[in-house]
Curated annotation (Swiss-Prot):
This is DELTA-miturgitoxin-Cp1a. GO terms for biological process: killing of cells of another organism. Expressed by the venom gland. Cleavage of the propeptide depends on the processing quadruplet motif (XXXR, with at least one of X being E). Domain repeats lie at residues 51-77, 115-141. Residues 51-141 are annotated as: 2 X approximate repeats with cysteine pattern C-C-CC-C-C.
Length: 183
């Protein structure tokens, strides 16, 4: 019980830290990155250095592998007698996650700053669904056939099953933690 309680509190703390960042925080970070600081000088220096592509030799520069879509590739070394050969590779778990997530596109701006509410027709604006709870709703379309056999699309903004499961688990964890501490 202590183990699960510890990890649920830790998960909620990390989730709160991720979700609590506002636009003001982002503006402060942009200002800090543009200022003449030690960190920005280091980043400028590291940008000038070329990275080693995947499946290329990295024996002389083990920390110089390029990034994938999300994660940085790792320099994997193999000893053959007295010689050691190193190659930039992508870890198996990183490959699985990147293939599942795919490219991370920027969220499109809604038309007229109004989003499509939950269960409303989104056939003309598939990328403009509103945000509900933690996640943004997604436009889901179904093929409908009328009495004449003509096919039409029925589209609506809905919450995917995996998002519903995560939000439900967080609600239960909140309730358990609140009941445990008398809140």
């Amino acid at each position: 019980m202590k183990f699960s309680l510890f990890f649920s509190v830790f998960f909620l703390a990390v989730l709160h830290a991720c979700l609590s960042e506002s636009e003001i925080d982002l503006e402060d970070e942009e200002h800090f990155m543009s200022s003449d600081s030690f960190l920005s000088e280091i980043q400028d220096e590291s940008r000038g250095k070329t990275c080693i592509e995947r499946n290329k030799e990295c024996t002389n520069d083990r920390h110089g592998c390029c990034r994938g879509k999300i994660f940085k590739d790792k320099c994997t070394c193999v000893k053959n007698g007295k010689t050691e050969k190193c190659v930039c590779t992508q870890k198996k778990w990183a490959k699985i996650i990147e293939s599942y997530i795919g490219d991370i596109p920027a969220l499109p701006k809604p038309v007229d700053d109004k989003c499509v509410p939950k269960h409303a027709d989104c056939s003309k604006r598939k990328d403009d669904c509103c945000k509900g709870g933690i996640f943004k709703y997604q436009c889901k379309c179904y093929d409908m056939y009328d009495d004449d056999g003509e096919k039409t699309d029925l589209c609506g903004c809905v919450s995917p099953v995996e998002h519903q499961a995560i939000e439900g688990a967080l609600r239960i964890a909140k309730k358990l933690i609140g009941d445990r501490w008398g809140r």
